[in-house]
Amino acid sequence: MKLSDFDFDLPSELIAQYPSSERDNSDLLIAVTPPIKTKFYNIIDYLKEGDLLVFNNSKVIKAQLNLGKNITINLNQKLSDDSWSAFAKPARKLHVNDEFYFDNHKVIITEKLAMGEIKVKFKLNDISVFEFLNKYGEMPLPVYIRRSHSLCHPVATTTGSKTYLNNDWIPWSNHGMTNTQNDNDRYQTVYSQIEGSVAAPTAGLHFTKDILDKLKAEGIQATFLTLHVGAGTFLPVKTENIHEHKMHTEYCSITPDTAEIINKAKQEGKRIIAVGTTTLRTLESSCNNGIVKAGSFKTDIFITPGFKFQTADMLLTNFHFPKSTLFMLICAFAGFKEMHELYKYAIKEAMRFFSYGDATLLCRK
Protein backbone atom coordinates (compact mmCIF):
# COMPACT_ATOMS: atom_id res chain seq x y z
CA MET A 1 0.00 0.00 0.00
CA LYS A 2 1.03 3.61 -0.56
CA LEU A 3 1.50 6.35 2.01
CA SER A 4 -1.12 8.46 0.23
CA ASP A 5 -3.69 5.73 0.94
CA PHE A 6 -3.61 6.80 4.58
CA ASP A 7 -4.10 10.51 4.00
CA PHE A 8 -7.18 12.51 4.99
CA ASP A 9 -8.04 16.17 5.42
CA LEU A 10 -7.87 17.32 9.03
CA PRO A 11 -8.82 20.90 9.95
CA SER A 12 -6.09 22.34 12.16
CA GLU A 13 -8.64 23.65 14.65
CA LEU A 14 -9.42 20.05 15.64
CA ILE A 15 -5.90 19.52 17.00
CA ALA A 16 -6.40 19.72 20.77
CA GLN A 17 -4.09 22.29 22.36
CA TYR A 18 -5.29 21.68 25.91
CA PRO A 19 -6.88 18.73 27.72
CA SER A 20 -10.61 18.61 28.40
CA SER A 21 -11.90 20.26 31.58
CA GLU A 22 -11.82 16.88 33.34
CA ARG A 23 -10.03 13.71 32.26
CA ASP A 24 -13.21 11.72 31.69
CA ASN A 25 -15.14 14.62 30.13
CA SER A 26 -13.54 14.02 26.74
CA ASP A 27 -15.68 12.55 23.98
CA LEU A 28 -15.67 8.84 23.18
CA LEU A 29 -16.62 7.45 19.78
CA ILE A 30 -17.82 3.84 19.74
CA ALA A 31 -16.96 2.31 16.37
CA VAL A 32 -20.24 0.58 15.56
CA THR A 33 -22.68 1.17 12.70
CA PRO A 34 -23.77 3.92 12.99
CA PRO A 35 -21.08 5.30 15.33
CA ILE A 36 -22.11 6.29 18.85
CA LYS A 37 -20.70 9.53 20.25
CA THR A 38 -20.75 9.70 24.03
CA LYS A 39 -18.63 10.91 26.94
CA PHE A 40 -15.66 8.93 28.17
CA TYR A 41 -17.17 8.55 31.64
CA ASN A 42 -19.77 6.29 29.98
CA ILE A 43 -17.17 3.78 28.77
CA ILE A 44 -18.35 1.26 31.36
CA ASP A 45 -21.62 0.96 29.38
CA TYR A 46 -19.68 -0.58 26.46
CA LEU A 47 -17.70 -3.11 28.49
CA LYS A 48 -18.90 -6.20 30.31
CA GLU A 49 -18.05 -8.41 33.25
CA GLY A 50 -14.99 -10.54 32.55
CA ASP A 51 -13.41 -8.11 30.10
CA LEU A 52 -9.68 -7.54 30.63
CA LEU A 53 -8.24 -4.06 30.13
CA VAL A 54 -4.49 -4.00 29.50
CA PHE A 55 -2.80 -0.68 30.35
CA ASN A 56 0.67 0.76 29.73
CA ASN A 57 1.97 1.94 33.10
CA SER A 58 4.98 3.85 31.77
CA LYS A 59 5.46 7.27 33.35
CA VAL A 60 6.40 10.35 31.33
CA ILE A 61 9.62 11.97 32.48
CA LYS A 62 10.37 15.69 32.24
CA ALA A 63 12.51 14.98 29.21
CA GLN A 64 12.82 18.51 27.82
CA LEU A 65 15.87 20.48 28.95
CA ASN A 66 16.54 24.12 28.08
CA LEU A 67 20.31 24.44 27.79
CA GLY A 68 20.43 28.20 27.33
CA LYS A 69 21.59 29.98 24.16
CA ASN A 70 18.11 29.15 22.76
CA ILE A 71 18.97 25.44 22.65
CA THR A 72 16.52 22.75 23.73
CA ILE A 73 17.08 19.02 23.92
CA ASN A 74 14.45 16.32 24.27
CA LEU A 75 15.68 13.05 25.71
CA ASN A 76 14.71 10.00 23.68
CA GLN A 77 16.05 6.70 25.04
CA LYS A 78 18.11 5.61 28.01
CA LEU A 79 21.44 4.08 26.92
CA SER A 80 22.93 3.47 30.37
CA ASP A 81 22.47 4.76 33.91
CA ASP A 82 24.03 8.13 33.00
CA SER A 83 23.73 8.32 29.19
CA TRP A 84 20.77 9.07 26.92
CA SER A 85 20.09 9.68 23.26
CA ALA A 86 18.29 12.96 22.59
CA PHE A 87 17.12 15.31 19.87
CA ALA A 88 18.52 18.86 19.88
CA LYS A 89 17.07 22.03 18.44
CA PRO A 90 19.02 23.59 16.86
CA ALA A 91 21.65 20.86 16.84
CA ARG A 92 24.05 23.00 14.79
CA LYS A 93 24.76 25.10 17.89
CA LEU A 94 26.07 22.09 19.80
CA HIS A 95 29.52 20.53 19.68
CA VAL A 96 30.98 17.36 21.16
CA ASN A 97 32.28 18.01 24.70
CA ASP A 98 30.07 21.07 25.23
CA GLU A 99 29.14 21.21 28.90
CA PHE A 100 25.98 22.63 30.45
CA TYR A 101 25.76 23.26 34.19
CA PHE A 102 22.58 23.10 36.24
CA ASP A 103 23.68 24.32 39.66
CA ASN A 104 26.33 21.71 40.62
CA HIS A 105 25.21 19.15 38.01
CA LYS A 106 26.56 18.80 34.48
CA VAL A 107 25.24 17.62 31.09
CA ILE A 108 27.89 16.81 28.47
CA ILE A 109 27.38 16.41 24.71
CA THR A 110 29.22 13.17 23.89
CA GLU A 111 28.21 12.53 20.26
CA LYS A 112 26.42 14.21 17.34
CA LEU A 113 24.45 12.03 14.95
CA ALA A 114 22.23 12.69 11.91
CA MET A 115 18.85 14.47 11.88
CA GLY A 116 19.46 16.45 15.07
CA GLU A 117 20.09 13.40 17.22
CA ILE A 118 22.78 13.60 19.89
CA LYS A 119 24.05 11.60 22.85
CA VAL A 120 24.46 13.16 26.28
CA LYS A 121 26.04 12.12 29.55
CA PHE A 122 24.89 13.27 32.99
CA LYS A 123 27.46 14.06 35.69
CA LEU A 124 25.27 14.44 38.76
CA ASN A 125 25.93 14.88 42.46
CA ASP A 126 24.05 12.42 44.66
CA ILE A 127 20.84 12.35 42.60
CA SER A 128 19.54 10.10 39.84
CA VAL A 129 18.87 11.26 36.29
CA PHE A 130 15.12 11.09 36.96
CA GLU A 131 15.49 13.21 40.11
CA PHE A 132 17.54 15.71 38.10
CA LEU A 133 14.87 15.87 35.39
CA ASN A 134 12.10 16.35 37.94
CA LYS A 135 13.93 19.45 39.17
CA TYR A 136 15.27 20.97 35.95
CA GLY A 137 13.27 19.44 33.12
CA GLU A 138 9.91 20.27 31.56
CA MET A 139 7.14 18.02 30.33
CA PRO A 140 7.92 17.20 26.67
CA LEU A 141 4.72 18.23 24.91
CA PRO A 142 4.37 17.19 21.25
CA VAL A 143 5.37 19.71 18.59
CA TYR A 144 1.79 20.03 17.33
CA ILE A 145 0.75 21.61 20.63
CA ARG A 146 1.53 25.21 19.72
CA ARG A 147 0.82 27.64 22.52
CA SER A 148 1.95 31.18 23.12
CA HIS A 149 5.08 31.69 25.21
CA SER A 150 3.63 30.71 28.55
CA LEU A 151 6.19 28.17 29.71
CA CYS A 152 8.87 28.98 32.25
CA HIS A 153 12.44 29.27 31.02
CA PRO A 154 15.62 29.01 33.08
CA VAL A 155 18.04 31.85 33.60
CA ALA A 156 21.36 31.02 31.93
CA THR A 157 24.90 32.37 32.08
CA THR A 158 27.31 31.36 29.31
CA THR A 159 31.11 31.24 29.54
CA GLY A 160 32.83 29.84 26.45
CA SER A 161 31.43 26.39 25.72
CA LYS A 162 30.08 26.06 29.26
CA THR A 163 26.59 27.22 30.16
CA TYR A 164 25.50 27.60 33.77
CA LEU A 165 21.82 27.36 34.67
CA ASN A 166 20.41 28.07 38.10
CA ASN A 167 17.04 27.24 39.53
CA ASP A 168 15.55 30.72 39.13
CA TRP A 169 12.66 30.96 36.70
CA ILE A 170 11.10 33.71 34.62
CA PRO A 171 7.35 33.02 34.60
CA TRP A 172 5.23 33.88 31.56
CA SER A 173 1.64 32.77 31.91
CA ASN A 174 -1.70 33.49 30.24
CA HIS A 175 -3.80 31.52 32.70
CA GLY A 176 -2.59 32.39 36.17
CA MET A 177 -0.98 28.94 36.17
CA THR A 178 2.01 28.01 34.04
CA ASN A 179 1.37 25.39 31.38
CA THR A 180 3.95 23.13 32.97
CA GLN A 181 2.02 22.95 36.23
CA ASN A 182 -1.14 21.78 34.45
CA ASP A 183 0.67 19.51 31.98
CA ASN A 184 2.66 17.82 34.74
CA ASP A 185 -0.66 16.38 35.88
CA ARG A 186 -2.72 16.02 32.71
CA TYR A 187 0.03 14.68 30.40
CA GLN A 188 0.40 11.73 32.77
CA THR A 189 -1.93 8.78 33.37
CA VAL A 190 -3.29 8.36 36.90
CA TYR A 191 -1.85 4.83 37.04
CA SER A 192 1.65 5.60 35.71
CA GLN A 193 4.39 3.95 37.73
CA ILE A 194 7.60 3.20 35.84
CA GLU A 195 9.58 6.23 34.67
CA GLY A 196 10.93 6.21 31.13
CA SER A 197 8.54 7.60 28.49
CA VAL A 198 9.24 10.87 26.69
CA ALA A 199 5.67 11.07 25.39
CA ALA A 200 2.44 10.00 27.02
CA PRO A 201 0.59 6.77 26.17
CA THR A 202 -2.37 9.02 25.49
CA ALA A 203 -5.31 6.59 25.43
CA GLY A 204 -4.90 6.24 29.17
CA LEU A 205 -5.13 9.97 29.88
CA HIS A 206 -8.94 9.76 29.98
CA PHE A 207 -9.11 7.36 32.92
CA THR A 208 -9.74 8.61 36.46
CA LYS A 209 -9.30 6.66 39.67
CA ASP A 210 -13.08 6.75 40.05
CA ILE A 211 -13.60 5.10 36.64
CA LEU A 212 -11.00 2.45 37.47
CA ASP A 213 -12.79 1.71 40.75
CA LYS A 214 -16.16 1.43 38.98
CA LEU A 215 -14.73 -0.93 36.36
CA LYS A 216 -13.34 -3.16 39.10
CA ALA A 217 -16.69 -3.15 40.92
CA GLU A 218 -18.38 -4.34 37.70
CA GLY A 219 -16.04 -7.32 37.40
CA ILE A 220 -13.91 -5.79 34.65
CA GLN A 221 -10.28 -6.77 35.17
CA ALA A 222 -7.16 -4.67 34.68
CA THR A 223 -3.51 -5.54 34.25
CA PHE A 224 -0.41 -3.57 33.32
CA LEU A 225 2.61 -3.82 31.05
CA THR A 226 5.28 -1.27 30.15
CA LEU A 227 6.37 0.36 26.92
CA HIS A 228 8.54 3.47 27.25
CA VAL A 229 7.33 5.76 24.48
CA GLY A 230 10.22 7.30 22.52
CA ALA A 231 10.39 10.52 20.54
CA GLY A 232 10.31 8.42 17.39
CA THR A 233 6.56 8.05 17.85
CA PHE A 234 6.24 11.50 16.24
CA LEU A 235 8.54 10.83 13.28
CA PRO A 236 6.74 11.03 9.92
CA VAL A 237 6.71 8.33 7.29
CA LYS A 238 8.71 9.70 4.36
CA THR A 239 8.56 6.81 1.89
CA GLU A 240 5.60 6.43 -0.48
CA ASN A 241 6.02 2.66 -0.21
CA ILE A 242 5.09 2.25 3.45
CA HIS A 243 7.02 -1.01 3.76
CA GLU A 244 10.28 0.90 3.19
CA HIS A 245 9.70 2.87 6.40
CA LYS A 246 12.09 2.06 9.25
CA MET A 247 10.40 2.01 12.65
CA HIS A 248 12.04 3.32 15.81
CA THR A 249 12.73 0.90 18.66
CA GLU A 250 11.20 1.14 22.13
CA TYR A 251 11.75 -0.70 25.40
CA CYS A 252 8.95 -3.02 26.60
CA SER A 253 8.37 -5.23 29.61
CA ILE A 254 5.70 -7.76 30.56
CA THR A 255 5.82 -9.36 34.00
CA PRO A 256 5.08 -13.07 34.47
CA ASP A 257 1.92 -12.17 36.43
CA THR A 258 0.62 -9.97 33.61
CA ALA A 259 1.37 -12.60 30.97
CA GLU A 260 -0.46 -15.22 33.05
CA ILE A 261 -3.52 -12.98 33.51
CA ILE A 262 -3.73 -12.24 29.78
CA ASN A 263 -3.23 -15.84 28.68
CA LYS A 264 -5.79 -17.10 31.19
CA ALA A 265 -8.36 -14.56 29.97
CA LYS A 266 -7.72 -15.62 26.36
CA GLN A 267 -8.13 -19.30 27.23
CA GLU A 268 -11.43 -18.54 28.95
CA GLY A 269 -12.72 -16.63 25.92
CA LYS A 270 -12.73 -13.26 27.69
CA ARG A 271 -12.34 -10.07 25.67
CA ILE A 272 -8.91 -8.42 25.76
CA ILE A 273 -9.04 -4.63 25.43
CA ALA A 274 -5.73 -2.91 24.70
CA VAL A 275 -5.65 0.60 26.14
CA GLY A 276 -3.59 2.40 23.53
CA THR A 277 -1.46 1.53 20.53
CA THR A 278 1.61 1.17 22.76
CA THR A 279 -0.13 -1.61 24.67
CA LEU A 280 -1.23 -3.32 21.47
CA ARG A 281 2.25 -3.14 19.94
CA THR A 282 3.77 -4.61 23.10
CA LEU A 283 1.25 -7.46 23.20
CA GLU A 284 1.76 -8.36 19.55
CA SER A 285 5.55 -8.13 19.88
CA SER A 286 5.52 -10.56 22.80
CA CYS A 287 3.05 -13.05 21.34
CA ASN A 288 4.16 -16.41 19.96
CA ASN A 289 1.53 -18.82 18.60
CA GLY A 290 -1.17 -16.99 20.51
CA ILE A 291 0.69 -17.04 23.84
CA VAL A 292 1.88 -13.78 25.44
CA LYS A 293 5.44 -14.23 26.72
CA ALA A 294 6.82 -12.47 29.80
CA GLY A 295 10.12 -10.61 29.57
CA SER A 296 11.88 -7.34 28.79
CA PHE A 297 12.75 -6.55 25.18
CA LYS A 298 12.88 -3.87 22.50
CA THR A 299 10.35 -3.68 19.71
CA ASP A 300 10.26 -2.00 16.32
CA ILE A 301 7.05 -3.71 15.23
CA PHE A 302 5.34 -1.94 12.31
CA ILE A 303 1.69 -2.93 12.01
CA THR A 304 0.02 -2.33 8.64
CA PRO A 305 -3.07 -3.74 6.89
CA GLY A 306 -2.72 -7.49 6.44
CA PHE A 307 -1.14 -8.01 9.87
CA LYS A 308 -2.49 -11.06 11.73
CA PHE A 309 -3.40 -10.02 15.27
CA GLN A 310 -3.12 -12.61 18.04
CA THR A 311 -4.03 -10.75 21.21
CA ALA A 312 -6.50 -7.89 21.62
CA ASP A 313 -10.16 -8.05 20.65
CA MET A 314 -10.70 -4.33 21.13
CA LEU A 315 -8.54 -1.21 21.09
CA LEU A 316 -9.09 2.05 22.92
CA THR A 317 -7.10 4.83 21.28
CA ASN A 318 -7.05 8.54 20.51
CA PHE A 319 -7.42 9.98 17.00
CA HIS A 320 -4.19 9.90 14.99
CA PHE A 321 -2.33 11.87 12.34
CA PRO A 322 -2.98 11.37 8.63
CA LYS A 323 -0.30 9.17 7.03
CA SER A 324 1.05 8.13 10.44
CA THR A 325 2.14 4.64 11.48
CA LEU A 326 -0.58 4.72 14.14
CA PHE A 327 -3.34 5.42 11.62
CA MET A 328 -1.96 2.50 9.61
CA LEU A 329 -2.15 0.37 12.76
CA ILE A 330 -5.82 1.11 13.40
CA CYS A 331 -6.61 0.48 9.72
CA ALA A 332 -4.97 -2.92 10.15
CA PHE A 333 -6.92 -3.58 13.34
CA ALA A 334 -10.40 -2.34 12.50
CA GLY A 335 -10.48 -2.10 8.70
CA PHE A 336 -9.03 0.31 6.14
CA LYS A 337 -12.33 1.50 4.69
CA GLU A 338 -14.03 1.48 8.08
CA MET A 339 -11.39 3.73 9.68
CA HIS A 340 -11.49 6.25 6.86
CA GLU A 341 -15.28 6.42 7.28
CA LEU A 342 -15.02 6.66 11.06
CA TYR A 343 -12.52 9.51 10.84
CA LYS A 344 -14.77 11.37 8.39
CA TYR A 345 -17.55 11.07 10.96
CA ALA A 346 -15.27 12.21 13.79
CA ILE A 347 -14.18 15.26 11.80
CA LYS A 348 -17.79 16.11 10.93
CA GLU A 349 -18.61 15.88 14.65
CA ALA A 350 -15.67 18.19 15.49
CA MET A 351 -14.01 15.63 17.71
CA ARG A 352 -10.61 16.59 19.06
CA PHE A 353 -7.47 14.93 17.72
CA PHE A 354 -4.10 13.71 19.02
CA SER A 355 -2.59 13.64 22.51
CA TYR A 356 -5.06 15.87 24.36
CA GLY A 357 -7.94 14.89 22.12
CA ASP A 358 -10.87 12.48 22.28
CA ALA A 359 -10.90 8.68 22.19
CA THR A 360 -12.44 5.91 20.13
CA LEU A 361 -13.21 2.29 21.01
CA LEU A 362 -12.52 -0.10 18.12
CA CYS A 363 -13.35 -3.75 17.56
CA ARG A 364 -10.94 -6.01 15.70
CA LYS A 365 -12.19 -6.79 12.23
UniProtKB/Swiss-Prot annotation:
List membrane-spanning regions. none
Sorted UniProt keywords? Cytoplasm, Queuosine biosynthesis, S-adenosyl-L-methionine, Transferase
Gene name tied to this protein:
queA
Q: Which GO terms describe its biological process?
A: queuosine biosynthetic process; tRNA wobble guanine modification
Query: From the UniProt record, which GO molecular function terms apply?
Result: S-adenosylmethionine:tRNA ribosyltransferase-isomerase activity
Major localization listed first in the record, in broad terms: cytoplasm
Q: GO CC annotation: what is one?
A: cytoplasm
Under catalytic activity, the entry for this protein gives: 7-aminomethyl-7-carbaguanosine(34) in tRNA + S-adenosyl-L-methionine = epoxyqueuosine(34) in tRNA + adenine + L-methionine + 2 H(+)
- Gene3D superfamilies xrefs: QueA-like
Where in or outside the cell is it found? Cytoplasm
Metabolic or biological pathway, per its Swiss-Prot or TrEMBL entry = tRNA modification; tRNA-queuosine biosynthesis
Annotated InterPro entries? QueA, QueA_dom1, QueA_dom2, QueA_sf
Family membership: Belongs to the QueA family.
EC number(s): the record gives 2.4.99.17
Record the organism.
Rickettsia rickettsii (strain Sheila Smith)
Query: Whom does it interact with, and what assembly results?
Result: Monomer.
Name the enzyme's class: transferase
Function text = Transfers and isomerizes the ribose moiety from AdoMet to the 7-aminomethyl group of 7-deazaguanine (preQ1-tRNA) to give epoxyqueuosine (oQ-tRNA).
Q: What is this protein called?
A: S-adenosylmethionine:tRNA ribosyltransferase-isomerase
